[in-house]
């Protein structure tokens, strides 16, 4: 009887222990499941609802970046992103950025990215390339600097210093005076954090690519060097925005060059005055400069703007026969009238002047009404 009571008491005493152990196991199971679930979610599950682009600047810390990402309204679970950032050493327990862990750059977050992928992307600098577009009129170095700096992390001063750095430019075969020829307007795939050296490398590669064996032969046939092609092309580029006319304009200037005539190109006068003139007058033609093609025969010492491929192709493939002159069309549509003789040129010039006078009178009458 006493043995049965002892056994019963033992069972009674062991029951709470079993319950405790079982409860601990259940809690541990659910805790492991909870932690494991969070780890799985952080590493494997998409935590973003849409695509977004972010730019990380050198002076930004991870809190700034976190705020930038959250502002895009694409984060499903902020806690998941914070955990991933902390695990990758980007975020400490006090929400302070990890030292030297965050990589500046342009990043793209997509809807299939996990929190861990984004954290590693930021830590390892897995940037998305950007398209740097160089287009339009570029008559000043400051314009080139502004166009590049607006699309890259570098500032305009960095670009300007490079365009003035003769030692740097000499590595590419150019000088600060003729650097316009180095730039080839186009769309380039670059990384937002690329240095100015990388940009210049790409320009030189594009420049070299243009100068095929066939184009070199065409230049020699015109009696021009590569730089002289760029120089004449820059004048053509400044003369008109109507690309189909480029070969005709180039033809006129080449004819004048071959006959020993002065180019008398208005854009070279504009260049002498840093393109600040609204209208070129006779007094402006007396400006003493090697770039003044009214005063000096031949080509200017260097390009007066970034010429571009269309104008360079026009110089290599001119049209227009024996034309030696051209003037603006009286239709005011941006085109020109071409002539082989001075007398025909005067007729065209008078027609334009007559149309211009009539246009100005009409404008004055409208203002009076």
Where are each of the predicted segments found?
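N-terminal Lys/Arg-rich, disordered targeting/topogenic segments
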Residues: 1-15
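Hydrophobic, aromatic-rich alpha-helical transmembrane segments
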Residues: 15-19, 345
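Bacterial extracytoplasmic/cell-wall-associated proteins, especially those involved in peptidoglycan
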Residues: 150, 154-157, 168-369
């Amino acid at each position: 009887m006493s043995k049965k009571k002892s056994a019963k008491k033992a069972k009674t005493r062991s029951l709470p222990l079993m319950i405790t152990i079982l409860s601990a196991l259940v809690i541990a199971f659910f805790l492991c499941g909870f932690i494991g679930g969070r780890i799985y979610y952080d590493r494997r599950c998409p935590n973003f609802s849409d695509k977004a682009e972010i730019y990380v600047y050198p002076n930004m810390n991870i809190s700034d970046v976190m705020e930038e990402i959250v502002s895009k309204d694409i984060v499903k679970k902020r806690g998941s992103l914070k955990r991933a950032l902390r695990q990758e050493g980007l975020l400490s327990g006090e929400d302070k950025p990890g030292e030297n862990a965050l990589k500046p750059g342009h990043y793209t977050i997509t809807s299939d990215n996990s929190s861990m992928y984004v954290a590693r992307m930021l830590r390892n600098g897995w940037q998305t390339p950007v398209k740097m577009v160089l287009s339009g009129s570029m008559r000043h170095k400051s314009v080139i600097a502004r166009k590049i700096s607006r699309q890259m992390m570098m500032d305009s001063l960095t670009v300007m210093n490079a365009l003035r750095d003769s030692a740097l430019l000499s590595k590419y075969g150019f000088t600060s005076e003729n650097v316009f020829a180095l730039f080839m307007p186009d769309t380039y795939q670059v990384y937002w954090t690329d240095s100015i050296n990388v940009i210049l490398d790409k320009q030189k590669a594009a420049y070299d690519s243009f100068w095929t064996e066939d184009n070199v032969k065409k230049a020699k046939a015109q009696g021009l060097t590569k730089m002289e092609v760029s120089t004449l092309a820059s004048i053509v580029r400044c003369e008109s925005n109507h690309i189909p006319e480029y070969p005709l304009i180039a033809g006129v200037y080449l004819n004048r060059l071959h006959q020993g005539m002065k180019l008398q190109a208005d854009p070279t006068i504009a260049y002498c005055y840093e393109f600040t003139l609204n209208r070129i007058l006779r007094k402006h033609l007396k400006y003493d400069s090697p770039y003044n093609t009214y005063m000096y025969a031949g080509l200017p010492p260097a390009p007066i703007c970034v010429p571009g491929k269309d104008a360079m192709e026009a110089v290599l493939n001119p049209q227009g026969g024996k034309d030696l002159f051209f003037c603006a069309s009286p239709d005011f549509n941006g085109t020109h009238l071409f002539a082989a003789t001075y007398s025909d040129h005067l007729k065209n010039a008078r027609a334009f002047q007559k149309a211009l006078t009539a246009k100005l009178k009409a404008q004055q009458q409208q203002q009076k009404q």
